[in-house]
């Protein structure tokens, strides 16, 4: 069975927690896009693990894989493996595999990313971690891959081939071109290559063999649907494709293998950085949700903008991903809010819309049309079953199901593993 999990909003929906919950039933969990610009948090008891590269299934028995559609900063990978080993969790080549064709984020990518964002008149909210420039090099066939990082001779040869052009580009951007051939940084990367040499694998082959043997494989996305490089709110998007179809393309798995596609949906909506957010709440109410939900980025620490549930954006996410079920997160954050509002459509230049306009500049001009529901005062964080939820919380969930036309199978009422239950 091949299952794909993606975020249905702008990222930060709680994918890490749900993947961690479900991974016990899977033999392999594979990350298929993005880099360390994305972050996911997994809480086990009193321990909190903040991850940027390693898939969330690392904490259970699953083998975890990083596919060739990911752009990988080996320094971050080393930091994460060290963090786990500090907590007594061994992350060796039997536990973690990285595809040979995975593109490597080089120091010059990070330098160029920062220079480009500083020069922009309109900021797009990049994390300045070199993700975009690593993807540019991948498309231009100018990347350094994992297979080259772990082979000293190949790595140095490839770097010499690329260095003159990279130095010219950095100098033209007003930066210091010496970073490209900095001996200290080169030595650091050679050591990282040596550290991870045994981790190199063929991810597509591993996954397809596992599926042939009847094993269960989960593909884990980073970020969210509306940050997709093609279908998202351009130009305020990430550099990779974040939707379910990308899992097949990037991991090398045929679409007929897909069994389930699970959406992770927050009970409200958030966005970090720039870009349109039609239901955004400014002032005291927005701050209240931000504080109650701990809405601060795992990667950047930036406060997330908060808004009411946006159905038109969800409809588009459902169309783009073909979801078979939904996991609803952070329901507890809505406690004490009266009324609860669901955006069921937009007003755009006098027209009524029930689906987002294609162009970002038009989405900026959309005003939300709300349906109001009564809220609840009960603290939900100790709730262990759907039947224990207050009536108005159940009614909110039922209404979302009616509107989305996709079943909600899991509900989360807090950050802990034990704070998620099935909707029976």
From Swiss-Prot:
Its cofactor is Mg(2+). InterPro entries: Adenylosuccin_syn_GTP-bd, Adenylosuccinate_synth_dom1, Adenylosuccinate_synth_dom2, Adenylosuccinate_synth_dom3, Adenylosuccinate_synthetase, P-loop_NTPase. Binds 1 Mg(2+) ion per subunit. It catalyses: IMP + L-aspartate + GTP = N(6)-(1,2-dicarboxyethyl)-AMP + GDP + phosphate + 2 H(+). It is found in: Cytoplasm. Transmembrane segments: none annotated. Substrate binds at residues 298-304. IMP binds at residues 12-15, 37-40, 127, 141, 223, 238, 302. Pathway: Purine metabolism; AMP biosynthesis via de novo pathway; AMP from IMP: step 1/2. One of its GO terms (biological process) is 'de novo' AMP biosynthetic process. GO terms for molecular function: adenylosuccinate synthase activity; GTP binding; magnesium ion binding. GTP binds at residues 11-17, 39-41, 304, 330-332, 412-414. PROSITE patterns: ADENYLOSUCCIN_SYN_1. Its EC number is 6.3.4.4. Mg(2+) binds at residues 12, 39. The active site is at residues 12, 40. The keyword RNA-binding does not apply. The keyword Ligase applies. Belongs to the adenylosuccinate synthetase family. HAMAP family: Adenylosucc_synth. Homodimer. Plays an important role in the de novo pathway of purine nucleotide biosynthesis. Catalyzes the first committed step in the biosynthesis of AMP from IMP. This is Adenylosuccinate synthetase 2. It comes from Methanosarcina acetivorans (strain ATCC 35395 / DSM 2834 / JCM 12185 / C2A). The gene is purA2.
């Amino acid at each position: 069975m091949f299952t794909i999990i993606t975020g249905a909003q702008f990222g930060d929906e709680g994918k890490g927690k749900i993947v961690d919950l479900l991974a016990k039933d899977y033999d392999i969990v594979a990350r298929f896009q993005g880099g360390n610009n994305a972050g996911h948090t997994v809480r086990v008891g009193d321990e909190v693990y903040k991850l940027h590269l390693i898939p969330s299934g690392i904490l259970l028995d699953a083998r975890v894989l990083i596919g060739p559609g990911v752009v990988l900063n080996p320094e971050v990978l080393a930091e994460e493996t060290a963090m786990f080993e500090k907590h007594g969790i061994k992350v060796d080549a039997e536990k973690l595999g990285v595809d040979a064709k995975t593109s490597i984020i080089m120091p010059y990518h990070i330098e160029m990313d920062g220079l480009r964002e500083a020069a922009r008149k309109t900021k797009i909210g990049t994390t300045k971690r070199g993700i975009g420039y690593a993807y540019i090099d991948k498309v231009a066939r100018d990347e350094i891959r994992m297979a080259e990082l772990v082979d000293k001779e190949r790595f140095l040869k490839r770097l010499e081939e690329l260095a003159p052009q990279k130095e010219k580009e950095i100098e033209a951007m007003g930066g210091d071109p010496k970073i490209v051939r900095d001996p200290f940084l080169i030595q650091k990367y050679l050591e990282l290559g040596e550290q991870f040499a045994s981790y190199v694998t063929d991810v597509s082959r591993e996954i397809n063999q596992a599926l042939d043997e009847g094993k269960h494989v989960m593909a884990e996305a980073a970020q969210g649907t509306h940050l997709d490089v093609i279908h998202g709110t351009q130009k305020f998007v990430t550099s990779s494709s974040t939707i379910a179809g990308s899992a097949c393309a990037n991991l090398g798995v045929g679409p007929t293998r897909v069994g389930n596609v699970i959406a992770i949906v927050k009970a409200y909506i958030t966005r970090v950085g720039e870009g349109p957010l039609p239901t955004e709440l400014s002032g005291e109410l927005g701050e209240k949700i931000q504080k109650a939900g701990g809405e601060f980025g795992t990667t950047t620490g930036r406060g997330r903008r908060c808004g009411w549930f946006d159905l038109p954006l969800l409809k588009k996410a459902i169309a783009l991903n073909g979801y078979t079920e939904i996991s609803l997160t952070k329901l507890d954050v809505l406690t004490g809010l009266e009324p609860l509002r669901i955006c069921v459509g937009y007003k755009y230049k006098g027209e009524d819309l029930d689906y987002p306009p294609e162009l970002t500049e038009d989405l900026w001009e959309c005003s939300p049309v709300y349906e109001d529901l009564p809220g609840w005062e009960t603290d939900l964080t100790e709730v262990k079953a759907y039947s224990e939820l207050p009536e108005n919380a159940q009614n909110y969930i039922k209404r979302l199901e009616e509107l989305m036309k996709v079943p909600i199978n899991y509900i989360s009422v807090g950050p802990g593993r034990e704070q998620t239950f099935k909707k029976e």
